[in-house]
Amino acid sequence: MADTCPRCGSPGVVGDGCPRCRVKVSLYLASLEKMRRPPTPRPVATLAPVALAAPPRATTAPTPSATPRAAARRLAFHGSGGTLFGIHIVNILRTLVTVGVYRFWGRVRVRRYMLSQTAFEGDRLAYHGTGKELLRGFLKAILVFGLPVTALNLAGQLSGDELLANAAQVLTWAAVMVFVPVAMVGARRYRLSRTSWRGIRFSFHGRIWDFIKLFVGGSLLTSLTLGFYYPVFQTNQQAFMVSHARFGQRPFRFEGRGRDLLRSYLLAVLLTLPTLGLCWFWYQARKIRYFWEHTFFEAARFRATVTGRSLLNLTIGNLLLLLVTLGFAWPWVLVRNARFAFAYLTLEGVLDLAGIVQEPQRASATGDALSGFLGADVDLG
């Protein structure tokens, strides 16, 4: 008998699979039950009557430092470079045969594999994007951004008027300054909406216009201050991206301030020449720790312990792998990066998942395509 899908509400579900969201209904219901099941109460022990005795000597109460902390939870990555290499080779061959069209489906295969090999609390994440969505988003990005900017440049060059050519360049720069934040927000919204854990999807609720104002204003201030505003600008972007993200109906929270990174940033600027630029690995590690340690989900808080030395070793190892193999080690580099990120990241504190429910959402892949087109790719963390 036909039924309704418990995840997307689509009617006409026959059997155990939804034809619209492709979820396995029995597994979805089981995961929800697992999340909402209250802890099993312990049996209360009864005390038999005992003979009266002298009261025991008072014992010292445990100090606050002896109180056990909430367990630290970790993400785990179970993928392998060999398996991802097989996916990569097939993607290359199919992309060549289809004159580049298959690359959208290839990108989906890589994302799906990476997320399916990422586990939290014993359950894997899932990716629900499709190649058709990415292709459609790419075509929209070409129509919305690529063609107008190209036409603007050609008009300025063919006019033969220096004033018109300069005006065309200014308008092109203004268009890029608007489309980059549009692409960043669109990519964030699309990718989070296509990522789920235990059948519950992530989402993003930031308004594009708010981020355009933040991005344009921050870019201008960074230029006017000769780059010294940059750590504040980066922190403001991170705050926007994190604070408008949700898991189910519950939001993430970011409490960082850009001025906290200013001292480390200025020190890195001063040490750039003496250290041949290597000091920026330590600044990057400091920024990663700061961003994660000021990110919260409910009462739980993220912790990061990455160091500049470990980040430098990872980068050198990745570069050597790519150079020695002429780029064929790219899948192993992705796996190394994922394992590295999760090895230094924990989530500490009380985490109540029982009341989380799925929110209705809809997101286009146009922003995801624009981010790739403009090189403004954005990810969590």
Regions found by a protein language model. Give the residues of each.
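Membrane-proximal intracellular helices of multi-pass ion channels
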Residues: 137, 318, 323, 361-381
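Cys/His-rich metal-coordination motifs, chiefly Zn-binding "fingers/knuckles"
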Residues: 1-45
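Long, low-complexity intrinsically disordered regions
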Residues: 33-65
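Hydrophobic, aromatic-rich membrane-embedded alpha-helical segments
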Residues: 88-109, 215-235, 266-284, 319-336
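Hydrophobic, ordered structural segments
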Residues: 129-135, 141-243, 277, 331
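Membrane-interface extramembranous regions at the lipid-water interface
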Residues: 54-90, 105-139, 186-215, 233-266, ...
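Membrane-helix interface segments in multi-pass membrane proteins
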Residues: 148-176, 284, 333-361, 374-381
